[in-house]
Regions:
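Active-site-adjacent segment of FAD-dependent monooxygenases/related oxidoreductases
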Residues: 1-31, 46-48, 255-258
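Short, histidine-centered active-site or binding-site loop motifs used for metal coordination
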Residues: 6-7, 138-142, 202-203
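Conserved mid-domain beta->alpha element of the FAD-binding
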Residues: 24, 71-72, 179-260
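Structured helix-beta-strand junction loops
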Residues: 30-31, 120, 194, 246
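Conserved FAD-binding catalytic core of PHBH/FMO-like flavoproteins
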Residues: 26, 33-183
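Short, solvent-exposed loop/helix junctions and linker helices
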Residues: 13-18, 148, 215-218
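C-terminal helical "tail/cap" subdomain of flavin- and related membrane-associated enzymes
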Residues: 211, 226-305
Length: 305
């Protein structure tokens, strides 16, 4: 057990992205701000000029928004990143040879704390959304088909991989959601170009093992918000100029941590007996070294920004 509070005097909160989105919409509604939903063909344009704008279609009608700056918060598959010229942008990527099969179940979680399991059959994770909604994952091959996994098959495999005390007490039930997601690490540099600033998954992706995706998006927003505040209130562009550097410094540390968590707790197809011994030793060291636990804990709760 890694006591995050004792090791860092901080804690983590399980804050599902659905709930985050709901809360943000409620705040925006109270502020009477305008959100344009169901926009199509969104495209930032002229971001290398003093008059950038964004075009999009709404109900078949083309619209145009003039602006000072553009924040590209449109995710990994969004259009914003492609606006940066190929001669300027550089991408770094690691695709992992497995995925996560996850289910959402209207059952009480097996534990109030997250359980990470390294098993001969592969990784497993016991998580939660709330006291009546559980989220569980198991590692599967990339070519696995979701149709091959009945609820019962999933529960049987999960129980094999979890510690005995958890497997014996877990409450099973019908899944209300089931999916398989690939794992990858991805970073693009720079995270800004002229009047365009990439935020969150538009600029970087981490495997979910380290629980850093949303945490990184929030720190990007913090850096950009601080830069925008200085730009408009103090009329200085230093924050905007340094946005990419500041954000990437924290991004790469989270990329490293998520990579380490993934390689430590997953089984790789090409894993040799030597690799297995190294992995076993890594976990044993983590179990017995307070120094190692502190390194994991301070990264898991999120590095400062």
């Amino acid at each position: 057990r890694i006591n995050l509070k004792e090791l860092t005097n901080k804690h983590v909160a399980v804050y599902g992205q659905t709930e985050v989105t709901k809360d943000l919409y409620n705040i925006i509604k109270k502020e009477n701000d305008n959100i344009i939903n169901n926009a199509e063909d969104v495209l930032p344009q002229a971001v290398d000029t003093d008059a950038p704008f964004v075009t999009f279609k709404k109900e078949g009608v083309e619209k145009k928004i003039k602006c000072d700056l553009v924040a590209g918060c449109d995710g990994f598959h969004g259009i914003s990143r492609t606006v940066i010229p190929k001669s300027i942008i550089k991408s770094f990527e690691r695709k992992y040879p497995f995925g996560w099969l996850g289910i959402l179940s209207e059952t009480p979680p097996v534990s109030e704390e997250l359980i990470y399991a390294n098993h001969g059959n592969g990784f497993a994770l016991a998580s939660m959304r709330n006291e009546n909604l559980s989220r569980y994952y198991i590692q599967t091959p990339l070519n696995e088909k979701i149709e091959a996994w009945t609820d019962q098959k999933f529960w049987d495999e999960l129980k094999k991989r979890l510690p005995t005390e958890a497997a014996d007490t877990i409450i099973t039930g019908s899944s209300i959601e089931k999916s398989i997601a690939p794992l990858r690490s991805f970073v693009c540099e720079p995270m800004s170009w002229e009047k365009l600033f990439l935020v969150g998954d538009a600029a970087h992706i981490v495997p979910p093992t380290g629980a850093k995706g949303l945490n990184l998006a929030v720190s990007d927003v913090y850096y950009l918000h601080d830069a925008l505040k200085k730009h408009y209130q103090s009329h200085t562009n230093e924050g905007l100029k340094n946005y990419s550097h500041n954000a990437l410094s924290r991004v790469w540390k989270a990329i490293r941590f998520s990579w380490w968590m993934t390689t430590t707790f997953h089984k790789f197809p090409e894993q040799s007996s030597f690799d297995q011994r190294i992995q076993d030793s890594e976990i044993e060291y983590l179990e017995n070294s307070v120094a190692s636990q502190k390194v994991l804990a301070e990264n898991y709760v999120g590095l400062p920004y």
